[in-house]
Design a protein with these regions (language model features):
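Short loop/turn motifs that connect adjacent beta-strands in outer-membrane beta-barrel proteins
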Residues: 27-33, 48-49, 68-87, 128-137, ...
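Short glycine/proline- and aromatic-enriched beta-strand/turn motifs that initiate or cap beta-hairpins
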Residues: 28-69
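Residues that define the transmembrane beta-barrel architecture of outer-membrane proteins
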Residues: 33, 53-59, 85-87, 113-119, ...
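Residues on the lipid-exposed face of transmembrane beta-strands in outer-membrane beta-barrel proteins
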Residues: 39-43, 59-65, 76-81, 119-127, ...
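Sequence/structural signature of outer-membrane beta-barrel proteins
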Residues: 42-48, 98-102, 126-130, 144-151, ...
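Extracellular loop and loop/strand-boundary signature of outer-membrane beta-barrel proteins
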Residues: 45-48, 77, 106-109, 146-153, ...
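Outer-membrane beta-barrel transmembrane domain signature
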Residues: 151-234, 242-245
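Predominantly the C-terminal beta-signal and adjacent terminal strand-loop region
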Residues: 224-281
């Protein structure tokens, strides 16, 4: 069985911090790169649909890179492939933590989930912007392909999760306070839904019947971030809620709840930054 390593936990929390601590809307001059370190605390279920969750604290690395092509910021790590006035095409990266079935009652006796990586293109479309340039509304259209990490890689199939995104700077009139919100549906192939929610015959029990998930609707997500910088210190928080009602796998015996929530907070000391400044929205 695979357990979540401290390194994997750091990467996951760092990815969320990229979304939390880099939120903005108005064009400003910022360092080309920044890095830092600090404590973070995250609470997350074992997987979407699990009624068991983990809390962990880690020393969290923080990296922001505002390159012309490669960027690590509020949308995660990505390579910008093409851009126009109100839209651009990215190639982005994401992933999932490994989960040990030895610690999850619903999956007892089944193989654990390996750590996985998601990669794929995403089209970002700017829909509107406030007159003061403090609020921007965007539509994000991603398509990702997933695969497990380790010696024997396994395909997880495809997923798309279009979201409506709102970014706001100087939230509640507080200078430097930034917030964001995103919401939208998730759709996945049978292969992806099956990896998380299938119960093969050899693992069926009296209370966990054999099950095969279908392709299609995989839930609705709602996420929010809030952050504030004080000179050399970043303070940030994030939260996410997914509703799994009426999904293609809602009746899987591995789905113990249709409500998925995760969140975290972090305090980051910015240890270094570039002298070079770039214009960033």
């Amino acid at each position: 069985m695979t357990a979540a390593t401290p390194f994997a936990r750091c990467l996951t929390l760092a990815a969320w911090l990229g979304a939390t601590l880099a939120t903005g809307a108005q064009a400003v001059e910022l360092p080309r790169w920044e890095f830092g370190l600090g404590p973070g605390l995250v609470s997350v279920p074992d997987y979407r649909g699990s009624d068991e969750r983990r809390q962990f604290a880690v020393a969290t690395p923080f990296l922001i890179y505002r390159g012309d092509t490669i960027k690590t910021d509020r949308e995660g790590t990505r390579a910008q492939l093409w851009g126009a006035d109100n839209m651009h095409l990215d190639f982005y990266f994401g992933g999932n933590l490994p989960v040990s079935s030895a610690r999850n009652q619903a999956r007892a006796g089944m193989p654990g989930f390996k750590g996985s990586l998601d990669i794929g293109p995403a089209l970002d479309i700017r829909l509107s912007e406030s007159a003061d340039q403090l609020t921007v509304v965007k539509l994000r259209l991603p398509l990702s392909y997933g695969f497990t990490l380790g010696k024997s890689q396994q395909s997880l199939g495809w997923q798309t999760a279009p979201t409506l995104n709102i970014y706001n700077r100087n939230t509640f009139g507080w200078q430097g306070l930034s917030a964001s919100m995103r919401t939208g549906p998730i759709f996945a192939t049978r292969q992806r839904n099956g990896y998380f929610y299938d119960v093969p015959e050899q693992y069926a029990t009296a209370t966990r019947p054999a099950y095969e998930a279908s392709a299609g609707y995989a839930g609705w997500q709602l996420g929010a971030t809030l952050s504030k910088r004080f000179e050399r210190v970043w303070v940030g928080a994030f939260a996410r809620y997914d509703n799994l009602s009426r999904t293609a796998f809602h009746d899987s015996p591995l789905v113990r709840t249709h409500h998925y929530t995760m969140g975290g907070v972090a305090l980051i000391w910015v240890l270094g930054e570039s002298a070079e400044r770039v214009n960033v929205e």
